[in-house]
Every structure is written in structure tokens, then in C-alpha cells.
């Protein structure tokens, strides 16, 4: 079995929202905030090569949303899912299983691609795996989490 770290880019979120009750004086040392209290976060996935299976755990935020959506997240960096897969000699069509830890946009937004006016699965040779609780939460989100879907 081989494991690969797959970086799909970076985005920014409010440090206080991410670290909660942990004082800024502590978290700011390891993840410094900018002038708007935003911290950079890696959109990193895990690729598992096991025999003839290539399992992708999460897939980043993708690019199907519009500019209005993404302007809130300050996307930066040159990494993409396709570039990171290619670095190890793989293509998205090689993925045999797409596992989603949960259904927030930054973990599963790359599951679907826009082709013209249609949305199509990004991994055409892979079933998608998650669980019922996450599906129900995404379809019927609570007020606190609905912006994440």
C-alpha cells in the first residue's frame, strides 16, 4: 500500500471561527492571521494506492461554483487536484473509489465538474462513498453549517 498527500490549493477562513475558544495568542503563533483575522488552510486530500485500487479521500473545493461564492474564501496557490495527481503519475480517471469524510464544500466540492450547462461526476470510474448521517446533514443542514454545503 502507498499513501500520497494530494494538495488541491489553499483558502482562507476566519481564525476565530476555526479555533473557537482557543485564545488567538496561542493559535496565531502556528497559523498567523492576516489583517482581517483570516488564516490560510491547505485543501489537502489523501490518495491510497492498494493493489489495483486507487482510493481518493476527499477532493478539495473544485471549481464549479461561481466567482461570487469563491470571493469569500480567497483561494490561492497553484496546486490543483489534477496537477497533484499528475505529479504521482495518476489522472482522475484512474480513481477507483472516491471517499468523502463529510460533505462540506472544501472536502467534496471537487466531486462534480461543470461541462457546459451540466454537472457531471469528476471521477467517472469510481463509486462515491460517505455515510447517511452526513448526507442527511447536507440535504437538511442546520443554520450553523448551511453555508458549508
Language model features with spans:
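Extreme N-terminal starter segment of soluble prokaryotic enzymes
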Residues: 1-2
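Conserved beta-strand hairpin/beta-sheet module of binuclear metal-dependent hydrolase folds
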Residues: 9-87
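Residue-level marker for buried hydrophobic side chains located in beta-strands
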Residues: 55-57, 99, 128
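Short, glycine/acidic-enriched loop or turn micro-motifs at the edges of active sites
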Residues: 61, 105, 134
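A short secondary-structure junction signal
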Residues: 67-68, 110-112, 139-143
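Metallo-beta-lactamase
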Residues: 76-79, 84-90, 94-106, 122-149
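Metal-dependent catalytic neighborhoods of phosphoester/phosphodiester hydrolases
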Residues: 108-118
Amino acid at each position: 500500500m502507498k499513501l500520497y498527500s494530494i494538495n488541491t490549493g489553499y483558502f482562507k477562513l476566519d481564525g476565530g471561527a476555526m479555533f473557537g475558544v482557543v485564545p488567538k495568542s496561542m493559535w496565531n503563533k502556528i497559523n498567523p492571521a492576516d489583517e482581517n483575522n483570516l488564516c490560510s488552510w491547505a485543501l489537502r486530500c489523501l490518495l491510497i494506492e492498494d493493489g489495483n485500487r486507487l482510493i481518493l479521500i476527499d477532493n478539495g473545493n473544485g471549481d464549479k461554483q461561481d466567482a461570487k461564492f469563491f470571493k469569500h474564501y480567497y483561494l490561492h496557490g497553484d496546486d490543483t487536484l489534477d496537477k497533484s495527481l499528475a505529479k504521482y503519475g495518476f489522472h482522475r480517471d484512474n480513481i477507483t473509489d472516491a471517499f468523502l469524510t463529510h460533505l462540506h464544500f472544501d472536502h467534496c466540492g471537487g466531486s462534480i465538474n461543470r461541462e457546459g450547462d451540466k454537472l457531471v461526476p469528476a471521477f467517472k470510474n469510481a463509486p462515491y462513498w460517505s455515510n447517511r448521517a452526513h448526507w442527511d446533514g447536507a440535504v437538511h443542514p442546520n443554520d450553523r453549517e448551511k453555508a458549508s454545503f
